[in-house]
Amino acid sequence: MFDLDGTLVDTMGGFADIAAEVMAARHGVEWAWARGKYVETSGLPFCKQLEVVFPAHAANKAASDEFEARKLAVCDATSMDALTIEGLEALRGLGLKLVVSSNTGQTVVDAFVAREGFAFDLALGFDPAQGLGKGRPHVERALAVFGVSREELLFVGDSLKDADLADECGVRFIGRLGTFRDEDFRRRDPAAVFVPHVSELPALLERMMGADS
């Protein structure tokens, strides 16, 4: 299972800039401070990030709506790079099912998959009406669709919150460096496993599967 933004596509820098502009304008905080808070709480839907940073603030709903509208331009302009696609194809060659698990709205995730043309086995986004969201709802859906156990699932994400969600769901986690550094993941868990890029996952997983056999 792959997180989308910051893991499969390099959108986090653009998202962080937009989030900082929105919070600076609507909450009256410094741009640099707001950007740092966005990155720090990444891995949650932006509406929930705002509740962490500004609990029960009257501006949160409008700020969330503005961010979600403005981030679409970044989504539309950003594609998976060639190395990411190469890595995904190699993972499929190992017989693995490939799932997108994102807090971005389901319609945006569907548009991403259609635009990229890569045949993910399952693409899940944030859809409250369907009870879908990154974490337990997505894990339960994947378990049901593929008929596998939690021990057979692996979540790959770029944020510390992604690692928290994986732990809460009882699935293994591999960090994708970029949004956070190796020392950030190690500070959270000294035994953390991470890769600089998705393209390095196939070799790592081959070694892991060999060790498990």
Question: What feature does the model see in each segment?
Answer:
Residues 85-93, 143, 163-167:
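Surface-exposed amphipathic alpha-helices with a cationic face
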Residues 37-38, 118-133:
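A short, structured active-site edge motif that brings together acidic residues
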Residues 135-163:
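Conserved Lys-Pro-Asp/Glu-containing loop-to-beta segment of HAD-superfamily phosphomonoesterases
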Residues 33-35, 120-122, 150-153:
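Short acidic capping loops at alpha-helix termini that bridge into adjacent secondary structure
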